[in-house]
Amino acid sequence: IPCAIDPLVRQTAQHRFRQTLAAAQKLGIRQVVLHGGFIPHVYFPEWYVEQSVLFWRDFLQEVPPDFVLALENVMEPSPDTLVSIAAGVDDPRLGLCLDVGHANTCVSRTPPLDWIAPMAPYLRHVHLHNNRGQDDLHAPLDEGTVPMGEIIGAVLEQAPRATFTIE
C-alpha cells in the first residue's frame, strides 16, 4: 500500500511493484494496472493523496519512459483522489484505470458515468463488469445497473486512447 502509515508496509508495496514491473517487462507488457490502496475510514483523503504523490514520484524513477502504471479505483467514493494523485505526479507514465463496477458499489458516492470526465485526461484503461449498485459482483455486462453503452461511448469520446478489459 503506497500510502501506508507503516514504512515497512510501504517498502513491501514498493518491492512488490518492482517485481510486477520486472515481470511485465520480461513479458513485453507495457501497461500494468495497480491498486492505489485507499481504505475509507482509515486514510484521510488529503493525506492519502499527499503520500501517494510522494510514493509514485519516487517509484516512477524506475519505470521506463514507454511504460504506463494505471491506478485503479477500488474503494474510492469519487474520482477526486485518483485524479489528484495523477495531477500531482504529473508524469505520463502514471495513468488511471476506471473500474466501472467498483464505481457502482456501495462505497462510491459518484455514479459510474460521472467518473469519466474528471479521469479522462489520465484514463488509460477501463475494467467493464456490472452489478446492482451494492456489491462487487463482476456480473455480465448486461446484468446490472451500470449503463454500459453510455459508459463505453463516453470513454471512447473523452479518452480515446483508453483500452478495455471485460472482467
Where are the regions a protein language model picked out?
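Conserved residues at the C-terminal ends of beta-strands
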Residues: 35, 129, 167
